[in-house]
């Protein structure tokens, strides 16, 4: 893996688990989420992330890995999981309001949604303005659409 501000990182199949475990329930989402570098995912080496973190993929084929382990993985970005909830516009809007969130970064995998339409429904912009900024990941966990509120770690 090549990056503009780092030395090359080598990831290969010897680092990967042969079978990638998946999360079995919403309650099994750990406190850490890892987003692999796109090159790792495209090379089919997600098992290297699950092996390095002792984690599980949120749902088959989505690429996000959750774990109980707080480890530095040079080929994945780590997030602290603040909140896990079933996806619903009303419940997410209520959570954002309760926490004073006025700016939102939306990441998604495995969920078909229009970001701009969701922002209109949530009544929230991209920039924080007078409130706080948050990052939400819309994805599936064990087949269920969920929202993971995360902080870069």
Report residues per predicted region.
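SAM-dependent transferase fold signal centered on methyltransferase-like domains
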Residues: 1-153
């Amino acid at each position: 893996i090549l990056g503009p501000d780092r030395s090359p990182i080598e990831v290969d199949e010897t680092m990967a688990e042969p079978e990638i475990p998946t999360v079995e329930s919403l309650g099994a989402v750990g406190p850490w989420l890892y987003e692999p570098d796109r090159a790792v995912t495209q090379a089919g080496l997600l098992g290297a992330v699950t092996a390095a973190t002792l984690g599980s993929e949120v749902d088959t084929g989505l690429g996000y890995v959750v774990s109980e382990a707080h480890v530095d993985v040079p080929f994945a970005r780590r997030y602290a999981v603040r909140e896990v909830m079933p996806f619903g516009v009303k419940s997410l809007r209520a959570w954002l309001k309760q926490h004073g969130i006025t700016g939102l970064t939306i990441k998604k995998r495995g969920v078909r949604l229009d970001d701009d339409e969701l922002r209109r429904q949530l009544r929230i912009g991209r920039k924080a303005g007078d409130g706080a900024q948050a990052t939400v990941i819309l994805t599936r966990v064990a087949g269920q659409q969920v929202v993971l509120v995360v902080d870069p770690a």
